[in-house]
Amino acid sequence: MAASTMALSSSSLAGQAMKLAPSTPELGVGRVSMRKTAPKTVSSGSPWYGPDRVKYLGPFSGEAPSYLTGEFHGLSADPETFAKNRELEVIHSRWAMLGALGCVFPELLARNGVKFGEAVWFKAGSQIFSEGGLDYLGNPSLIHAQSILAIWATQVILMGAVEGYRIAGGPLGEVTDPIYPGGSFDPLGLADDPEALAELKVKELKNGRLAMFSMFGFFVQAIVTGKGPLENLADHLADPVNNNAWAYATKLCPGK
């Protein structure tokens, strides 16, 4: 009987795939199903986090107030005053760029073996008060200066003539822009292209502002350390812990 039943079962299942296990495992009378659930986003409940966080406090918004234009208050309110301040800024920027180069370049040459007298910028001019006077570039046959009054008068005459020429617009008064007069003041023709000139104006102003800050730093270094900018830089690189602005500031505190 059992043998015949197994034979019938085998014949009836011939050619069919046998299902050895149910698709869903059964434990007792219940079913266990495996589901893949996505993690739920849990809100922190804090107003300082998330995409909807508070970015500005109080009545402020993401837009800057109309009166914040990046300029000092009141200095650009009057167009004439602004034009005058811009002219002064550009002129001081140019002098600062020349001065910064004059402070660094002689010291750089001296550190590389070039001998031309005193290389530190604030010590070079004081040589005129010495007994032998001041030799330009360390060469007595070039310019041998012994009178500070003569140097002052010469500088006033030369600089005054150039500045007067610039402000007056040249000998014929044809120059309309005293800051960028062009002509003889632009021998390379950099102002021929208006777009290039506009870009150069911005670069000149940015580099000039940096040079003015650099000159201020050179002044402070000379007063505090009594050394030139490159010597101060070398000392800082050799011992950053003991040669920095904070270390010198603490030495100047009362009671030190």
Curated annotation (Swiss-Prot):
Residues 1-34 form a transit peptide. Photoregulated by reversible phosphorylation of its threonine residues. GO terms for cellular component: chloroplast thylakoid membrane; photosystem I; photosystem II. Chlorophyll b 2 binds at R94, I143, L172. Chlorophyll b 4 binds at Q155, R166. Chlorophyll b 3 binds at S147, E163. The lineage of its organism: Eukaryota, Viridiplantae, Streptophyta, Embryophyta, Tracheophyta. The keyword Metal-binding applies. Binds at least 14 chlorophylls (8 Chl-a and 6 Chl-b) and carotenoids such as lutein and neoxanthin. The light-harvesting complex (LHC) functions as a light receptor, it captures and delivers excitation energy to photosystems with which it is closely associated. It is found in: Plastid, Chloroplast thylakoid membrane. This is Chlorophyll a-b binding protein 2, chloroplastic. Chlorophyll b 5 binds at Q155. Chlorophyll a 4 binds at N207. It comes from Glycine max (Soybean). The modification Phosphothreonine is found at T37. Chlorophyll a 1 binds at S76, E89, R209. The gene is CAB2. The keyword Isomerase does not apply. Chlorophyll a 6 binds at H236, A245.
